[in-house]
């Protein structure tokens, strides 16, 4: 089986397990993610943190994002601007949310574009080395590469439910390993990146 086919199969399996969680299990786990993340993720006042508006059966990190705002973070959310590019628009209290592509919501096109210092990254599956499988469009890989081209090295924390862990994610040259994974069981530093 090719790496692409293996990734697709791992994505399908991990999403099926995540989808099988009851709504109550997802809510409880999401609240635990907030409690752990709010306590363990270091945020300096003014630090730019990108989050994501949950789609489908994803972890709901909105409580965590607002906890990080209370610690002084400036928040932003991804917006799909075309088939290959996402930008991060500032999330300001009281601003209306609009459809931002890929089934997500966020600030409209008039919002300020920010470069995140810390990225809370959605994923379909992850392994203990910090490799992730996204949803297949490559938006985050390209966004991270663009930040690197600007000399910005955002701290990358994958956020998922513990059931989304797989034994091994095939790693391709363009894939960027995560510094840590946050699940309802804790914030785990990933050994391959040496961060945290």
Regions found by a protein language model. Give the residues of each.
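N-terminal active-site beta-alpha-beta segment that forms phosphate/nucleotide-binding
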Residues: 2-116
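Surface-exposed, charge/polar-rich loops and edge strands
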Residues: 2-5, 16-20, 106, 110-119, ...
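Short glycine-rich anion-binding loops that position phosphate/pyrophosphate groups of nucleotides
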Residues: 54-57, 124-128
